[in-house]
Curated annotation (Swiss-Prot):
GO biological process: one example: symbiont-mediated suppression of host innate immune response
Stretches the record annotates as Beta-lactamase-like: 21-233
Family: Belongs to the anti-Pycsar protein Apyc1 family.
SMART domains: Lactamase_B
The protein's role, per its UniProt record: Counteracts the host Pycsar antiviral defense system. Phosphodiesterase that enables metal-dependent hydrolysis of host cyclic nucleotide Pycsar defense signals such as cCMP and cUMP.
Organism: Bacillus phage vB_BsuM-Goe3
Cofactor(s), by name: Zn(2+)
Subunit structure: Homodimer.
Protein name: Anti-Pycsar protein Apyc1
Family annotation (Gene3D superfamilies): Ribonuclease Z/Hydroxyacylglutathione hydrolase-like
Annotated keywords: Host-virus interaction, Hydrolase, Inhibition of host innate immune response by virus, Metal-binding, Viral immunoevasion, Zinc
Superkingdom, natural source: Viruses
Length: 259
């Protein structure tokens, strides 16, 4: 049993970033379970550059089905099947996304086999996570680990979720994944969690919270709460904005944080 929960940003980049890997976090819980939050197309390379082998990964949690969050799943599935002898890891998926993840995204490259058509559970141990359209829904994974999912608005008619990570009964971190600016969700996250990792686009307008919106929000909250916010999912021009985020900080790709 480890003393602390650890989080490392595998990638911090926006969907179109060429300097940074797709936004993704590697979390090690105190029981040693290694969880990857989202697996975009460049994330397997990001894990490799961290020196973290796929053999050490225990599970992947998916927050929504955009390619910069699921595009690397096919590589992981095929690597586990053909290189690691059919090893299965957990695939933790919000319940409404289980069917579309396979039917609309993954089956085009993964359903083919010499003997029969394959399904998602031929590659992963699929674990469905509870969701709620009116608030939070918690799923206990084992005696140590639980996840709370929060419905977010990212793109119209697309299901997307933020996730709260709980280790040994303690709320550890709120991870927005992708969402437009949501003052009420931020209020809740800052009240309930010691750390908040929030997506941040560096221009106003679009399908993510903008830096201007987040700065406007933080002007009205205590500095202690501002210090809890790490910004992620940013563009390649992030250097232009260093020192212009108030008390908030840009999450650094590859840096380990003790939660």
């Amino acid at each position: 049993m480890l003393d602390t929960t650890k989080l490392t940003m595998v990638g911090t980049g926006s969907a179109f970033s060429k300097k940074f890997y797709n936004n993704s976090a590697l979390v090690t819980f105190t029981n040693g379970y290694n969880l990857l939050i989202d697996c975009g197309h460049s994330v397997p390379k990001g894990l490799h550059d961290l020196g973290f082998p796929l053999e050490s990964l225990d599970g992947i949690l998916i927050t929504h089905t955009h390619a910069d969050h699921i595009g690397g799943l096919e590589e992981v599935a095929l690597y586990n099947k053909f290189v690691l002898g059919g090893r299965k890891i957990d695939l933790l998926v919000p319940e409404p996304l289980v069917e579309p993840l396979w039917n609309d995204s993954l089956n085009g490259g993964l359903r083919y086999d010499d003997s029969r058509e394959l399904e998602l559970d031929d590659y992963f141990t699929v674990r469905s996570l509870k969701t709620s359209d009116c608030g939070a829904a918690r799923t206990q994974i084992d005696e140590n680990i639980a996840f709370t999912l929060y419905t977010t608005l990212h793109v119209s008619h697309m299901k997307s979720y933020a996730v709260g990570l709980i280790d040994r009964g303690e709320e550890k971190v709120f991870y927005s994944s992708d969402t437009v600016f949501d003052e009420y969700l931020l209020d809740y996250a800052l009240t309930m969690f010691p750390w908040v990792f929030h997506d941040c686009q560096l221009f106003t307008g679009g399908v993510h919270a903008s830096l201007d919106e987040l700065l406007g929000y933080t002007r009205y909250i205590p500095e202690k709460q501002q210090n809890k916010i790490f910004l992620m999912h940013y563009g390649d021009n992030v250097e232009e904005f260093i020192g212009k985020t108030g008390r908030m900080r840009f999450a650094e790709q590859g840096r380990e944080i003790i939660l």
